[in-house]
Amino acid sequence: MAGVKILENRIESNGTTIALNDAENCSIESNILVTKQDGVNYKDKNGLTLNECDNIKITDNYISGSARNGASVTDSSGNTLENNTIENVGMNGINIYNGSENNIASSNSVNSAKKHGIAVAANSSAVIKSNSISKAGDTGILIYNGSKGECSGNKVKNAVGHGIVFSKNASGKAASNTVSGAGKHGVLVTDHCGSVALSSNKISNSKQNGICVSNYSSSVSVNSNSISGSGKSGISVSSHSKASL
């Protein structure tokens, strides 16, 4: 399937509102996608799903109420998710997963996701820029499990867990992000990560450390960050990790 435009619809469903499989060069724009939480198909459904799709543009949509992820991108590459509003979802606001490469998530607003605001996982890659993420139930932005993420200009506020995390052999950079009110660390690099650069971030009022590098992570650079109001240390590097400050 190619060249399909899904534009200005209002969809209320007990299951996934829009699902594309094996599609390319399509657009999903200016839709209102609401998952109703009272049907037999509600459990384990995403708001919007891309599976084996390339070059899909997802813009200016409102997504609410899904049991799992607001927008799920699986085994799909070259897709753009921009200027969407995602709120009150059961897992991640945006989930980029399973070898999905060269995707972009920009200028989205993600509020009250029960797990992570934006997650990039399982050998995927994404540019994550200029998003506003608030009240994530765990982590604001998570890059993990062999994935690469370039995070810049994001605002992450009041995450219950960490603000931004690189974990499990992840790599990439976090630059010029604003992280405030994290319930744990503002920015965490952990679990054998390498080649991570943290620069020019503004991190305030983290309950634990502003920046934490731990658990055998190496080749981590920490430069020109502004850190205030941390409950523990501004910057913490464990004895089994290596970082240049």
Predicted regions and their residues:
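Compositionally biased non-globular segments, especially hydrophobic aliphatic-rich helices
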Residues: 5, 14, 26, 38, ...
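Low-complexity, intrinsically disordered/propeptide-like segments
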Residues: 10, 23, 36, 51-53, ...
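Extracellular beta-strand/beta-solenoid scaffold signature
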Residues: 12-21, 39-51, 65-73, 88-97, ...
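Short regulatory "switch" loops immediately downstream of catalytic or recognition motifs
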Residues: 32-38
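Parallel beta-helix/beta-solenoid
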Residues: 1, 6, 18, 22-24, ...
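Low-complexity/repetitive intrinsically disordered segments
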Residues: 1-9, 226, 231-245
